[in-house]
Amino acid sequence: PKMFILENVPGIEGKRGKNILHSALAKVEESGYFIHEKILDAQDYGVPQRRRRVVIVGERKDHKFPLFEYPKPQEHKITVREAIAYLPEPPEDGSDHPHISLHRRDRLSAKNIARLQALKPGQGRDFLPPELLADCHKVSSKIIGHRNVYGRMPWDDVAPTITARFDSFTRGMFGHPEQNRSISLREGAILQTFPEDFVFVGNKVEVARQIGNAVPVAMAMAVGLQIKKCLDKWNN
């Protein structure tokens, strides 16, 4: 191919993966490709989410110098409020919203609802009173990490990284900024910049995984447009 894209978490550059990755890229380079490698943060490309990913682009050496350039970061960061505040509350009974697919509230225990009620937007488990902390979290997050679990998203900042388990309030800062619920599957998809009418197939866990594992649409578009520019130069 004239070009290829590889995307992964920054951990691919860690101790366990770095040698394997760079050995593979060296072989690709030897076979006739320029290799471009950079960490991009989705929030810089129209995604209301903090999401750092390694994006590697291969460009076949049909010319003397490489033509590809990474997209330039945008100045404006889209906040959670800008992205999802317009959505109505999902039904109390856990059913889908009648006009918005996958917009429903998860069932939460009384204790998890109490945890949400104790938090302000942007706060995680470090702000919970002792009686609402899970036993495994009674040690400071400075020691064991995971400070954002059992958290509410901020309104006026980007969201944390949407993971494959963002549908669970216990797995991260996935509580709605002001309503006492975790964000819906549709809200997660919007924070990944999928169109509101995008159709996902599967059960709740499968759809959450599809959304959380996806490359955010707006970031993919930004990189894709740069590849198109590169190919246009190539053909001219």
Model-derived regions: residue spans:
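Class I S-adenosyl-L-methionine
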Residues: 1-143
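C-terminal target-recognition/interaction regions appended to catalytic cores
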Residues: 103-236
